[in-house]
Amino acid sequence: MLRIPHLNLSIILKESVMIKEVSQKQVPSYLRARRSKLSRYLARTALRILGWEVSGNIPDEEIIVVVAAPHTSNWDFIIGMLTILALNVNLKWVGKSSIFKPGFKWLFKWLGGIPVDRNNPSSLMEDVKDIVAREKGFIIGMAPEGSRKKVIRWKTGFLRIAELTQAKILFFAIDAPSKCILIGDIFKPTGNVEEDLKFVKNYFSAFKGINPDQF
């Protein structure tokens, strides 16, 4: 039986305001990307103008699967990409192949995007194997809801990837009321998909998305 942690959200959010500037210091050196200082500066500036902060640090783990939720708005993608740039983290993220259109494909791939064909999801596993084999540190991010709309059943691909790579799962919570991206707890899956999925969903139930009625 998994124990669901009790989150004292008031303490978490009180601590989050202590971080005024997003920095690559929140990321272990071997998990950082090779992006320019200008791109990082522009991303930090954009987050500051929008009023968003990033609290917490990415742990010193060689392989990490990031789970981001609640996903209820198109703004989640924009804020997420700005966060990746501002942290200068070498994070790969999974997106449906239809968004990788000409004109955007190069940008999304530069930002770490991996297109996945929903009719052939097994191809993602091959991509992950290739990346893990050639890179020292590997982080892949996914939104298990798979949609901005309210869904009952979350997708379990993140658990399969964690099992394939023997990775731990790191929670990225999007909390709209506080305008904070919280880099939260790290979780080692048990191998019981239903119990693990229940644990993850309960963790994120403490947070509210931009459109809370869709979560």
Residue ranges and their predicted role:
Residues 52, 89, 113, 166-167:
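Short glycine/serine/threonine/alanine-rich loop segments
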Residues 3, 28-32, 66, 94, ...:
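Residues at structural and domain junctions
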Residues 59-119, 173-176, 185:
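Catalytic core of membrane glycerolipid acyltransferases/transacylases, capturing the structured
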Residues 14-34, 38, 121-215:
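Non-catalytic C-terminal accessory region of glycerolipid acyltransferases
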Residues 13-65, 69, 78-81, 105, ...:
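Membrane-anchoring hydrophobic helices of lipid-metabolizing enzymes
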Residues 1-17:
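N-terminal amphipathic/basic-hydrophobic helices that include classical n-h-c signal peptides
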